[in-house]
């Protein structure tokens, strides 16, 4: 019998609604792997789910959050080849990752090559896959285009700068002045967060919503694309912002607005998410990507991990480590 520790959202609320339970790690069902987790990402989406503010599908409490994991396969479902045992893997889980053991569909798991650092790989499934989709598939960024990134020092923000640089785009990162040096390490031009008007851009990637979304639309050049992928601003209203995006799209002219949510792609096209993740793992192994880890927090301190991830000064990805 293998015991499991897991973070539980007992009800919606602040960080103190999180607790750590101990139970028996279930044997994996058909088509699934059980992964002994070595690192799990803590995302703004986890915080919004806990607070009852996430705009997408959320399990009813009590549930275990956690969008992404890396770890070692320690058990396999009855129809899964034994060759998976002992393999190091990374996967997008959507929920259930904040635990010592997580259940992962074998079809979603990507194997890690021998030398790859597991903590760096744990930054890929949510932040880097989101960034890849935003740049390649939604905004369809072309080399030489000006791309403006809000929240450039965060986990998705740094991923956007990292991948955008490889695309040959001119990247501009909006961040507090204390984070400008970090933005520059990714080869991007820092933009002061509180400046009155945003620089004009071909593509704007906005995770804040509200007044920020309106400023983003105003900053678009002809033929420009605005992609909203979150509502992190306290004054953002998801229904109002989504309506606004639809209205902007109906205006005459060639500027376009869209909304993107990775969880929708993961449910509709899990094969594509896995293909992108495999490609990112290869690029990480080649030293072309540089994920930034903001903090490593023990699994037994989930409230602290949520506070760190929710802090505007967090730079990069927060990891829970069992």
Describe the role of every protein-language-model region.
Residues 48, 88-151:
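NAD(P)H dinucleotide-binding glycine-rich loop of Rossmann-like/cofactor-binding domains
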Residues 84, 125-195:
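Mid-domain Rossmann-like dinucleotide-binding core that forms the NAD(H)/NADP(H) cofactor-binding site
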